[in-house]
């Protein structure tokens, strides 16, 4: 029989989750803790994807699994693909689209013949944290509100679940002015048969940059230094570079083709250009909140606890 993780140890691990996730380049805004069942708590990770993490004590470390259901879509994560935190405490992660922040995630853990269920949404998670009356004093509170504002803007832009906005009831800060991009994409060098066409920012279920190329001949003749497998679209190919964290939108991304042609681009260039160009008010609002989300993430990483770090506790 495996050693059970003590409640004290669990709370210590959960209270440290914020710092641990920051160290690997992602953001977390705290962990809500439970104690009565093997389902021990939840946290939210803000990286290139918005992820809700479910913490569970697992006895069958080979056969247990957790199933997530949201919007009638289901996904099962075996414990062998979950992240081990300590002893038999595992984290099962569910990525959602920003517009889904008010949709409940139904989580079902099957372990050693027993079934355990829980549910939460990013909005419900935020309410639980703020109910502690301390998180709203921390930089983590600002990060959570910026996240809800981003989610609400995505709902309105895509016409999704707009009767239940993520930021309903929360005071919305004025969106910071987005500066003009300092430079357009930069290209140096050349490779015969391939030309850079342009770049865009994808902000649907995850944040990514797409580099578009026109190609004469076989795409397999070209090697790209970063990114995923090239995808054909509209008589072109794009190479998608994922894992763009919100604090990094102003950082340049450099892609090299066959070690001869170099393309440099940053997500902020797209944000600035689209915000100042589009006449679609809902898209403009979404891009504005995405920019505010970026600024808040930068501040949060610089000082995650704000001026009230001595009062940091897990919401219970």
Which residue stretches match the model-derived regions?
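Generic detector of short, well-ordered, non-transmembrane alpha-helical segments enriched
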Residues: 18, 27-29, 220
């Amino acid at each position: 029989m495996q050693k059970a993780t003590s409640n004290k140890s669990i709370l210590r691990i959960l209270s440290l989750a914020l710092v641990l996730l920051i160290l690997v380049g992602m953001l977390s805004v705290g962990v809500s803790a439970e104690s009565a069942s093997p389902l021990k708590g939840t946290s939210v990770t803000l990286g290139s994807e918005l992820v809700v993490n479910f913490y569970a004590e697992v006895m069958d470390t080979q056969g247990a699994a957790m199933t997530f259901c949201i919007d009638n879509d289901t996904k099962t994560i075996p414990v062998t693909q979950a992240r081990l935190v300590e002893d038999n405490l595992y984290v099962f992660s569910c990525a959602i689209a920003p517009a889904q922040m008010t949709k409940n995630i139904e989580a079902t853990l099957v372990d050693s013949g027993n079934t355990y269920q829980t549910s939460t949404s990013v909005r419900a998670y935020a309410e639980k944290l703020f109910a502690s009356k301390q998180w709203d004093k921390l930089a983590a509170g600002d990060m959570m509100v910026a996240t809800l504002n981003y989610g609400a803007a995505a709902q309105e832009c895509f016409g999704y679940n707009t009767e239940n906005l993520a930021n309903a009831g929360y005071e919305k800060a004025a969106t910071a002015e987005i500066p003009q991009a300092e430079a357009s994409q930069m290209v140096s060098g050349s490779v015969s048969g391939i030309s850079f066409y342009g770049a865009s920012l994808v902000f649907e279920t995850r944040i990514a940059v797409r580099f578009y190329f026109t190609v004469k001949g076989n795409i397999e003749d070209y090697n790209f230094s970063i990114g995923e497998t090239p995808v054909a679209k509209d008589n072109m190919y794009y190479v998608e570079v994922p894992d763009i964290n919100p604090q990094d939108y102003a950082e340049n991304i450099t892609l090299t083709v066959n070690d001869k042609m170099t393309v440099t681009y940053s997500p902020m260039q797209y944000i600035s250009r689209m915000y100042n160009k589009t006449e679609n008010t809902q898209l403009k609002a979404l891009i504005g909140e995405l920019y505010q989300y970026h600024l808040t993430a930068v501040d949060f990483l610089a000082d995650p606890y704000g001026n009230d770090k001595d009062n940091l506790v897990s919401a219970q």
